[in-house]
Regions:
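Short acidic catalytic loops
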Residues: 1-14
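Gly/Ser/Thr-rich loop/hinge elements
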Residues: 6, 16-75, 102-108, 122
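Terminal peptide-recognition signature
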Residues: 9, 29, 65, 84, ...
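Extracytoplasmic/secreted proteins, especially bacterial periplasmic and envelope-associated proteins
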Residues: 20-24, 35, 75, 79, ...
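Short, well-structured beta-strand/strand-turn elements
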Residues: 72, 87-100
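Short acidic, Pro/Gly- and aromatic-enriched capping/linker segments at domain boundaries
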Residues: 110-120
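Conserved functional hotspot residues or short segments at active or partner-binding sites
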Residues: 120-185
Length: 185
């Protein structure tokens, strides 16, 4: 944190994870006991009161934050982005996310299992990313070539020297726009 001027949180390609983990991550950026998500189900037992960020000592993080999303950012990553957007803590940059705002329960059935959607989750403002996704504040079109370079970048250690050289000259358009966005905050 010392000397940090801004943070880019890259959630591109992140398929999600546990709701509780997303709430814990949000606790790194928001004050304790901030309401960040609630669930709404057809059955009242699947509707929850708002989940809050953890009660823990939080370092003062006043630097600007940009969250990077793409069409493959889903579920818990959408919750993190949506809550930070709703609470004006981050600028969302990139593409509209996947649109998976569902809460699912796995029901074991012998040698198989059934995954049943029991609710949708909602950001602090009450919106759900289900089907519509999280719409970025700064939209950036990502070309197929940029998408391929991003995949290469993530496995850079396994690339040949020639492949690394191509990446050395590549400028990630989403990161570039995110840096512009945080420099204006």
């Amino acid at each position: 944190d010392r000397g940090m001027e801004a943070l880019l949180l890259d959630l591109r390609g992140n398929p999600g994870g546990l709701l509780t983990a997303a709430v814990s991550i949000l606790g790194e950026f928001l004050p304790p006991s901030t309401e960040v998500v609630f669930t709404r189900g057809r059955n009242p037992e699947h509707t929850s009161p708002a989940m809050k960020t953890p009660e823990r000592k939080r370092r003062n993080r006043s630097y600007p934050v940009a969250v990077l999303l793409d069409r493959d950012s889903a579920s818990a990553s959408e919750l993190v982005a949506g809550a930070l957007q709703d609470l004006a803590r981050a600028t969302i940059v990139g593409e509209t996310s996947y649109g998976k705002g569902s809460v699912q329960r796995v029901m074991p059935m012998g040698n198989a299992a059934l995954k049943l959607t029991i609710a949708t989750y909602h950001t602090p403002s009450g919106r759900t990313p289900q089907e519509s996704g999280i719409i970025p504040d700064v939209e950036v079109s990502i070309s197929d070539e940029d998408r391929a370079n991003l995949r290469r970048q993530r496995r850079r250690d396994s690339l040949t020297p020639d492949q690394r050289q191509i990446l050395d000259s590549w400028v990630d358009p989403v990161v570039s726009r995110a840096l512009q966005a945080v420099s204006k905050q």
